[in-house]
Amino acid sequence: MYKQIEKWENIFSYFYIDGKIYVKTEENCILKELSLTGEVLWESKETEVRYYYVNNDVIIFNLESLEDKYTYDRTFIYDRRRKTLIFRGEIELNISYIFFNKNILNSNTNENIIVFDILKGEILKKIDKPTIGVTLLVTEKYVVKKYDPYIYIYVKSDYSLLRQQNIQDFFPGEEDLSILEIYSYKDTFIIIARVGIVCLSQKDGSLIWKSDYYACTMEIVGHYGYVCTSLSFYRVDLDTGEKYGYGRKYDRLPDFEYNGKNYWPAGHRVVYHKGLLWYRVYSSGESFILAIDPETANYQWIHKVETYEKVMDIKFYDDKMFVTDTDNNLFIYEEE
């Protein structure tokens, strides 16, 4: 299905836009625009780049403060195509990808919220109001944060606290509860809480459904959620909460064979692409990518990644598959 065409080292994070890859180098922490063959097309004059984000229109990044090495308040924005400077200023922005809605950044810290237009380099609104927890989800209407075992739902327009809920109330006595992921589905929030899943009304927080099956991650495709818990894999109907384990004991995925050797399918996440669920596995010191049929949970493709590190992420762009591992390697594959 895919063949490897490139392997790059020391890639801590990357963005893929219009056939180009944007990376931060280990040495001097310079931002670079690279072709798919690794040719340098552009690099930033600024060094010691800390956080960055790239979309179709802009490249935005920040540098360490000249006065406090734990503050990143020197912000730069470049036009991505022309490489001209749009904005340069001393403003501390949280430029994590989760806070972007097209070209509007809702920078969210524990002290304030800054709504910033990254095309114009202008502050649209500043709200000096503390918020609680780590942001897990931003929708058109809400910002959802968590501080175990609570979730905090803020109204996005003014960051007023709409509601806080103790998820432990749905799983009394469960000491392993941890809020891992939150998703927006129709007019509900789907909360992955390790010891189970809860579906709550966005409007009033009422319980729609709950499951008591362990869950670590979920990939939503249509009205189904595909859930992984190490060796187990099952499907949940997000409208009803009905679980389907493909008729397997403990919902366990079957072992697989590669070059005559048997492996456990130990992994934690699937990614949906072109009708298949792509599953990263680390077993017996080796990393694999398995393509799973979502209807049968049977394996359609087994590929060994040429690394002894754990595969961390799988993403698809155009006809390419991009894979990263824990040693900061980036593997680029092309569809066959």
Model-derived features: where do they sit?
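Secretory-pathway ectodomains
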Residues: 1-336
